[in-house]
């Protein structure tokens, strides 16, 4: 028990990177969509199209990341993992800092896409470090602590940014200049939290390659796909991950845009999503502790089922207090399902090929995110102006679009049950 409670310096440094990059993703979930809406409004973009354009930008970013996933995964298994991790980090942080320089909504989306690509690419290298940094018995806890402290730690720079944005006049700033400073603060926090990991991490597991041509990365992806099809327990798990994480990522990426499209109060939306971070912190730790007592597969099943219920609730969301309740519910399961999904894969793959398989996981995850974001964006655009009257409520086109996520969670649940059964049978042998 003592080993489980005490983290090594390297594990702490690894967790700290989650604290850094989570500040960016919190900004993506809160202030960035609202700032984009203001730029779009100034350019005369119709309000019914906000959610669609934001969704399309997120979809394009995930397509680019999915294409880069095989390259990042292959590079992560070679000796220069830390170097490529640093390059991805710098792309993401520089993109974050440059968001305030965008002259209009279209260029803003372009810079955002680059920042998102850097962020997501860095996670391939970061996640692949886990099997080297922690033992199998500790992976669930370390992974969960990464998300937990990421949620609570990211609140520190966010509160500073929120004060600047909500009260710019107090500091002699305009709304625009306050946002520029918020982007710079977040980028600096992200880089600062990464320094300990860059200093302490030294790659110990890698494969030797004869050359480093980029095309070999895609050939390796094809080889990995052929091999993983033979490893049915991994393949079915990745398929299930493709569907259920789709819903999770889509909810994270579009929560603020969804609330804003429904006409909810901006300040209330930001404070509600700040509440999500505080709720996610203890519940992420709780899931890490529960994984020591209960099967990881069972906890993932419970999380998927609860997320399905959350989406059903979101479909009928029409008021501010309901959004606050939604924020609490999401916070309860968001960190747990992400952390356990990461550590679940880490347990069923060979450590020396962690980069390869986590790169493949990233392709599946980002491909899913593309599907979810695009699905919501398309349905929202096709039903623009439509209203549905049910149970005495008037649901807008945004409510209708969100309902599409229910199917994805349902498919993910069925496939994960199959994958978990295969892994149990494999362990039993």
State each model region's role:
Residues 47-48, 165-188, 378-409:
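A membrane-interface helix-boundary motif in multi-pass transporters
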